Design a protein with these regions (language model features):
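Single-stranded RNA-binding regions, centering on S1/OB-family and related RNA-binding modules
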Residues: 1-76
Length: 76
């Protein structure tokens, strides 16, 4: 599946860390939701909002120079 910047798609949280969450996208690709892109409010602990295996809707913000997707839940 071709994932384009600006699209909104569903994914599954596969890892939660202090800095954000890794989300598996369709086609087996993964992307990062940085802690600042989880909610409009201040996020002290990512686990208050996201947990592994959660289904989330994310917006694809960009594909960085390393070929990694940067995602947003709050814009999704």
């Amino acid at each position: 599946m071709n994932i384009e910047v600006g699209t909104t798609i569903k994914g599954t949280v596969v890892k939660v860390a202090d800095y954000g969450a890794i989300v598996r996208l369709p086609g087996g690709k993964t992307g990062l939701v940085h802690i600042s892109e989880i909610a409009d409010a201040y996020v002290r602990d990512v686990r208050d909002y996201l947990n592994e295996q959660d289904e989330v809707t994310v917006k694809v913000l960009r594909l960085n120079d390393r070929g990694r997707y940067e995602l947003s839940v709050k814009q999704g």
